[in-house]
Amino acid sequence: MFDKKKNMIRIFIYENVMLYPPTLNLIECLLNNGYKVHLVAEGVRDLPAIIKENKQFSYTEIKAVKNSNIFLRLKKRSVKTKGYRAALKDTMDGDIVWTVNPSVVRTLGKELLEYSDRHVMQLMELTDTYPMFRGAKILKFNIKHYAQKAWKIVVPEENRAYIQKVGWNLEKLPYVLPNKPYYLKSGEVQEDMLPVIEEMKREKRKKIIYLGVISADRDLQSFAEAVERVKEDYCLYLFGKFRGDGAEEFKKLCDSYSSLKYMGFFNPPKHLEFLKYADIALVPYKPGEIEGSGFTILNALYCAPNKIYEYAGCNIPMIGTDVLGLREPFEKYNIGVCCRDLKPETIIDAIRYVDANHDEMVKNSKAFFDSADLDYIVNSIVND
């Protein structure tokens, strides 16, 4: 049985933890509520001081695998897998094992089933079948079996909870833990941020901003084209790390529009600093299947972006695509608008509408941000 004074919550995440702001939020929430946390992940050295300097926090850093030679990459991946599994074996009686993505469940493998009675399985994406390895089209990892055996399932959005329960025939409805920032402090301004801040301060046009992953399920092209048509009044700033295929296409996109400015990637929470200089924010989700990802075709339709909480917390009204995960909070709280289609004229109308109703949407943002109580939800997951 979990004893808060004696036991810890061991969080496992595959990939660099700094690419997952919701995981940082979870760690901050757990620490602030007096739990001991041990993180097993890549990128631990870049964690914010508020986490690393907490006496209740410890970690095992897994070295990243970066090599163009497929044989060396496979060899290093094998070493990486052993590192995760060794960290799992360090789990003490009563500790909670909290996995953050299906990739780490696949990596931990059958050994994880030994901890099923205290395994919290968090799903950042709406998941169906999962590839045995990245890009695999036929070979599948039985992620459903691990979910059915897990103690608790956690998802970031209510519709996803019901879909996941039915799709995987789960006994209980998953907990809903929104992707909301625990703190909205960007921290000390670093030297590499100064040129970007100065650039945004000098810009006289109204600034539309996108913060987040740059990937196939984000339709930046349509918004860039629309902003270009009203570039005398607006410009578009993109921040984020590219993921997946299509790097050349993204470079062409950046080169094609004079109103578009790509500013690179900044580790969270530093990226929040740039929201101080923005007027409107984008959430450009593109519904559809991403082959080999393991996410269902409904993933983007029922999106649950941490960005809408970051934007709302920083009082930035939003424009998004027409997906239910955005339409519901936008209409309930009046904090943004969804474009019914992605024609330039439709997007421009949305920009003009948000601009005209900016002050009202800013006032409404606080009510939306305050609607989720992370402390209550996380304590319920751990203790119920």
Predicted regions and their residues:
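Membrane-proximal helix-turn-helix segments that form the acceptor-binding/catalytic region
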Residues: 28, 82-91, 121, 127, ...
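Glycosyltransferase donor-sugar binding loop
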Residues: 41, 45, 211, 236-248, ...
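Nucleotide-activated donor-binding/catalytic signature segment of Leloir-type glycosyltransferases, i.e.
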Residues: 205, 247-280, 290
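A short, active-site helix/loop in glycosyltransferases that binds the activated sugar's phosphate group
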Residues: 107-108, 136, 143-188, 328-329, ...
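Nucleotide-sugar-dependent
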Residues: 218, 269-274, 283-309, 320-328
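A charged, aromatic-enriched C-terminal amphipathic alpha-helix characteristic of glycosyltransferases
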Residues: 177-178, 194-195, 341-345, 355-384
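Short His-centered aromatic/hydrophobic patch
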Residues: 99-105, 123
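Conserved donor-binding/catalytic core segment of Leloir-type glycosyltransferases
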Residues: 10, 181, 196-218, 224-227, ...
